[in-house]
Every structure is written in structure tokens, then in C-alpha cells.
């Protein structure tokens, strides 16, 4: 059965098998002989079908109402088993908002059985198809603002979105490119620029998913409206809400008022991008008929930054037309058609229009109501949609089009369209790491759901949070051109063409943005409808690297083979050349003293350092833009200015004046910096070590790893993982960074990245996190593909000819067991599959995607690979190659990397992951969150081992005391046994109650035997001279422990710290940089 299959039979809304029995008896009692006979004759077949169907989470399993639960618990039991299965808990015990979350990897469905009484953005799924999108609240439909929880730590700041709007979060509906025009925003970068041009942020359209259900019981009315207080909604039990990562359908099901079983199914159609469906089914398991009212509502008050044009109804449905704020010449329309077996009445107020149907639900029967919604805007086809009537006419046509069939047929066509994109096999699989497996599949889904192939004009725009949120005003940053694009390009190149089309659409404005007297084009930091320079989106004296990202996007598409020389001439070259021209004339200046080209008054990606000179990432990116312009010009036979070559070969790069030669983020940077996000590290990826060599790149990685602040955004550590994959020759930091990139940032239950590792504005550095943070989904995909396989779209260029190469540098993955598999990678008009297992890398050419493609692809294995060189892989051929294997950082260790698992029992500092303790890299660490409590870590050596000694490398915050204990028993054989059955002095056992059905707890002292305890001496005292250098420490505080014992499990405990004053604002506990046992 396909994911999200209904427990109702699709054609006649028949109930599930348990109530089916009751229905047969009820029919027989009324002498409905033929019906009863048919029911009984098919009972055995139906029951057998459901046994087969009962694979947990095959779509949306039916949950038997608690007040009338049969002894046959097939569906309920299996879902409960899934939620509490070790495989499922292994994922969600690591993620926030995930107490009752589940993931069914077979059907690729995520969901939760926990009813969120309070609507919170982290707990909400959404639907989207690249043109329309909507966030879905707890009841499965409708509009609500976020609601403050009853937690003692809840505060009003929890309800707010971030810069630049700082508005209250809500379950909004959005249309691609539907940007407004407004004088200003609450937050800006350069407020003085507001005088030069208005802002343009995304407008939320009226919420189209609202389909409420009302009933009166004992004189009190209850309504399924998520904006109401819980008392007005009524009791919700047996709750399940899920989202398919294969087709994007969101399904919500529950028992309401202990009386009805209600199911909502919502989709944004993948193929018919203007069409949304809300399908509701209500089942009455009782013995009396019940009257209910279904209301289809379009409420203009659920919109944001829109102006109402008309709200009304006709004989077939209801509709609303509107403009984005400040733009009367741009129109939007929503038309809703209700399909129900009853008399529909319609009414309206000044800002709301309803269509209602009163239905009688007979005992043991169900009713089905479907809402077909057409949504359109002028931007989709400006040449055809010239008036509001044109847009409304089209929306009405979409809503009432009989060709799409009934709800079941619409669901089927939607799934069919999705299957053409993702095909049958999962695009990424981590067989041995369920969290990475979910993160990869979710990231592909979220980026595909929020994009569509070849979108034109402003509808190709993709904001930081896609089509379900107005985080960052829905505006377009470099996040789209660099982070999202490089993440999804290898899987769906047609989708990323939309990003480039959007930049082409605004290219003339970018030309107009250039100051008088200069040439080229300059894009603003933020873009909406117009692409002009604004208070949020300055063009000058700020993040010039946005222009490199825009240029790089078109260049990457070209060298990937997804675009040809026609694209190069008409699209890529104008963008690249105009960027080069502007940068060469306006941004770059020749410094006679240095004999180099320099830059001034800019901001690199690290936005903690504004108005600096010679940003390392920016200067390096400028070099590449100059090179691309020259190569593209040569291919096309165009003359390019000599200055491009001069800048390419003589760009200044600031470096530290010592033997380590660390690249400075900007001229004059000192050692006290706290870096917001990946910056210099990005010189290695995606800028491929331009201006630096491998040694300098490696020392950069080590230095800047220690300088990242603990509250930076989620795109930082995917880059560190990629760079460690590329550079590290010992240890397994590539894999520890990979977990650091996902575990603190991914939110359950619907596997969406948050911008921050801590969502609390009061404690995370003052950020209201963007959500969902598609930037991180794109970054994570790059970490697993471009990182672990080393895949790069590369080329050679000789005699004005560009030869495409797929560069590969696959590495061994000791911490990831069976490795990783990739299917349906698109390169040079071919489909490839790639896999890393324990010993080899395998690549298969699965054939052409276009008839005119060559019969082969050319790959280049990196120099460090034992089989370095070029290889031709013909269509349908497969080849295997060795992996690059790092050596051990600590020879003879029994605990480094995959030899042991380190698991924190007490909380770590925000963003830290315990795998950093044994990854063989002293510049990564795990820090105890608090200094006034004991930090505890459990070590699993994976088998019974003889241990003679241990080494603790503390980093810059050694504890005052350390204690090591061993487990000598035999009843506990897994980490979860300890977590579930041992009282470590915190509430950890409550999170693992599923693994302790008897509820018996053991005291820590009864389980572990102390084998070492001692004070930690300072072996590397603080050296002010060293501290004030831009320098990776070569001295470490180390504690050596001599023991003689045998065990599999160890407990490490650390107390307090030596520092009496905080270093760099860090008030946490002890840091464990590396722990090694021999």
C-alpha cells in the first residue's frame, strides 16, 4: 500500500474492519439482508487484507477510539510499536520536539502520535509544490497564530519570527514570488537606504486549507478550528499526524469528543501547481445518528501584507481576490469548490466568505467532504493574467475542472507526478545510521517540495524558509544560489534552473544598481520582487560575495552538463561577466605597497565582522569570478578585459604573521574573534582551495573550528564536514562534523531544520530562528554527497575547449558502518548511482537522460586515491575503486572513531555532540552544559576489552576532578539498558521508559564500580602570548590514567572547571577534546 493510504475505503467511505462487523450486525438487525450478506461474505477477505495492510505507518493507520476499543489492536499496536521501537527511538531521542515522533523508512513517512495542544512552528508540517504552500496546524487544516505553551519557561518571544519582520508566527499560506511593496521593515541592515527604495517581502495569501467541522453536544457547540481555545475545540484523542517524504501529503487523524473519528488529508498538487486539495472524512462509530456542519472558509484576515479586492461567492463556490500590499497591478485569486453529499449554503461578511453543508452521519457510517482550491497570481503568466478577473477566472477553472477527477483520482495523479521526480528507490540511504538516513531523505524532500522545474520570473524565487513561512521576509539571499542550489542540483537540475531564471529576471535591475560611472551588475543582499538596493538588501559596502554566488550558480549548472553553450551565451556569461566587471571596477583596488589587488569596506559571510578590508572568502571568490569570465569568454569567442587576468593572478589574501600561516578572515583580525558561521573554511569548499594550499587549508579548518560561536546557524558544520572529508589524514572528524551538522538542528516530528541549535531567543544569542531552514537542508545534502564522495563538477580547459569531468574523492567511513548509497545522481545528461561500503566506492552509469548525450561520462579520481586518474564509464557500466582511508590519530587506541561509542548522559553545550570526544581531532570537543553539576559520559567499547590506560585531552577548559568507573555486571548489554534502567541523578530514564516496561531503576553506585578518581592538574598553563596569536594550540592540558581492568562499559564523570572567569563569554562546564583508552 502507498504511504498515507486511508483507513477508509476510498470509493464509499466504508469503515475499518472492527466497526465493519458492527455495521453488518446493525444492517442485519434492520433486515437489510443483501447488505448484511455481502458484508459477511467479504468479512474474511477484508480482515485478511487489513492484516496485510497493517504494516505500521503504511500511510495513516486507523486508531481505534479509546471508548470503544476492540480486543483486536492491529493498527494501534503496530503504530505504538513503531514509535517505541529501538530503531525509531535511536533517531528521535536525539531530536527536540520528538517525544512521540516516528519515521517509517519503508514508506518514507514521518509523523507523531502526540497531540500538540498549543500550536508551535516546530511541530507543524506543511504542503508545497514549488508554487503554492501552506503550513498545517495541529488539527490538520485552518489558520492560527502560534500559541504560548504552559511551560514555566515560555515567554512571548517564543511567538515571534525573526529579522526583518519580527512578526508573530502563524500557519500561513504562500504563493511563489507574491512579494509586496512596503516603505520599510522592522529590522534593516542600513536604515539610511530606506530613502532610496522601498522593501519587498513575501505576502501571505488567505489560508486556503480551512475546512472546519462543528457539532452541538448537550447544548454546547464544538468546532475544529485551530485558532480557538481548547475548550471550544473539545477533546482530541488517538491523535496521529504525518507527512509523506515521498509525496508531501499531510494527513491528520484523531478521535474527536470521544464521538467521531476524523481524518484530514491535504496536498498541493505536484503537477497541477495551482490546485490544492483538502479531503475530510468523518466516521461515526456510535449507535445514533449525529448532525454536523462542515464549513469551507476563506478568511481575508488570515493573510498578511495583502490588500482585499473582492470576497464573494457564486452558484458553484466561494472566492477571494487580492493584491500584495502596495501593488494594485498584481492580482491574486483563490477559488474553492466544495464537494459534499448535501445542500450547500453560502454567505459572506466584509472579509470572510463561507460555504456550509449540514450532514447527518448515520451510525457506523462515514461522510466525505472534499475541497478543491484553485490558486493563481498575475506573476505566473503576466501576459495572460492582465486583470483580477483573468486571475479569478483561471483559479475558478482550476477548482472546478472535472478532468482532475474526484479526491481519490487527484491523490493518485499527485503521487504519480511525485514518483516521476524521486522515482522508486530512495535517492539516499545510510543503512547503518538512521538519523543521517532520515536527514538526507527529508532534505531532498523539503528542497523538492519548495521548488518546481523551470519556473519563470519572480515565481522562481525561493526564500530561506520556502513556501510555508515568512522567515527572513521570504526574501532571497545567497542561501538560494549557493546552499540550496548546490544541494539539489545533483538530484534535480531542472528545479534549480528556476533559481537562475529568477536572477535573470532581475538582472537588468542589478545593472541599474551599479553606481553611475561604473560598469557591470550588482545584486542586493536581499531580493524580493524588484531586486533594488534597500535597507535590508544593500548593494554596496556589504556582502559583495552575493554576486559570486549568483555567478557560481549559473557556472555550476553549465559545467554539470545540465546546460549547454546556448545557456552559457545567453544566461551564464552575461551574469558572470557583469559580476566580474563590477567587482573589477568598483570593489577591487590595486595596492602599490603590496603589489596586490585588495578590497575595502565589506562584510564576509561572518556577519559579526562588518566593514572590514580584504575578506578572505570574498577576495577568493573574486578570483574565481575573473577566471570563469575569461573561460566563458574564450569558449564564446568574446574579448574580455585584461584586468580580469591581472586580478586573478595577483589578489591579496591576509594571513597570520607566524609559522602556521593561518588565513585571516580579514585584514587585522585578532585571536579573540568569535565567528558567526562558516567563512574562511569555505575557501576549501566550495572555492576549492583557491589562493591556499592543502596545508594552509587544514590549519584553517583547525583554527576556525575552535572559533565558531556556540549559537551559529545550521549551515556551518556541513561545510566543516566537507572540508574534513577533503583534508583530514587522521581520525574521523568528517563524520563527527556530519553529526554536529544535523543532531542539534533537526527538529522532530517532521524532520525540518531550524536555523539555530537552540530555539530560545533569550539564550541563543538573540535570534528568532528561521523555520524551516532550507539553507541547512541544502548544506546537509552537500555534506553527504560532495563531502563523503568528494564529488565536484570539474573541467579541463585547453584550446578554448571545456572538457567536463566528474571529480571524485571517496573516503572510508568507519563510523557509518555499511556506508552510504546514492541513486539517480544527474550529471552530464546521465543518471549515476554511487555507493561507499566498508571497502570500496562503486559508481554506475545508468544511462542517458537525453537522446543526444554521449555514451559515457568521464570521472577523475583525486590524487590521494590509490587509483588516481581519469576513467571513462560507458552507459550501463559499473566500476569500483578503493577508498582513501585516514590513519589513526592515536595508534593502539581501543576507543578511537568506530572502535567505541561515547554517549553523553548529562546535557552538553548547545550544538555539541558526544562523537566529538573520540573522533581523533583535538580541535573538536564536547562540553558539559553546566559547571555546577557533574558531567557524565557513557563509553561503549563494543566488546569486553582489557584496558591498561587512558588519556584525557581537555582543551581550554579542564575540569577540577575526573572519575572513571566500570560496569562489571552482565545484565546490561546495550547503551539503552543503562539509559532506561539506571538513575544517573537526572531525568534521562524518563526519555527511555519504552525500554524499561517494568519501571525498575538502579542507582548509579549499584551499577558502576569506581576504578579511578583524581584531581586534574594543569599541564599546559595559560600563556597570554600564545593566546593573543592567531594560532592553533600545540600544547594541551592532558591527564594520563593508569588502570588494569576488563570491561565493555565505562562511565566518565567530570566536575567543575579551573577557570574563575569565563573565557570568550563561555560559562559552560568542562570540555573533553579527546578521550583515548588503550
Swiss-Prot record:
Disruption phenotype: Lacks acid trehalase activity and decreases hypha formation and infectivity. Residues 1-54 form the signal peptide. Glycans are attached at residues 4, 17, 150, 184, 242, 287, 301, 350, 532, 591, 601, 661, 670, 829, 837, 904, 922, 931, 946, 1003, 1037. GO terms for molecular function: alpha,alpha-trehalase activity; carbohydrate binding. The keyword Chaperone does not apply. Its EC number is 3.2.1.28. GO terms for cellular component: cell wall-bounded periplasmic space; extracellular vesicle; fungal-type cell wall; fungal-type vacuole lumen; membrane. It comes from the Eukaryota. It is found in: Secreted, Cell wall. The keyword Glycoprotein applies. The active site is at residue 607. Substrate binds at residues 478-479, 676-677. Gene3D superfamilies: 1.50.10.10, Glycoside hydrolase, family 65, N-terminal domain. Induction: Expression is repressed by glucose and by HAP43. Belongs to the glycosyl hydrolase 65 family. Cell wall acid trehalase that catalyzes hydrolysis of the disaccharide trehalose and required for growth on trehalose as carbon source. Plays a role in dimorphic conversion and virulence. This is Cell wall acid trehalase ATC1. It comes from Candida albicans (strain SC5314 / ATCC MYA-2876). The lineage of its organism: Eukaryota, Fungi, Dikarya, Ascomycota, Saccharomycotina.
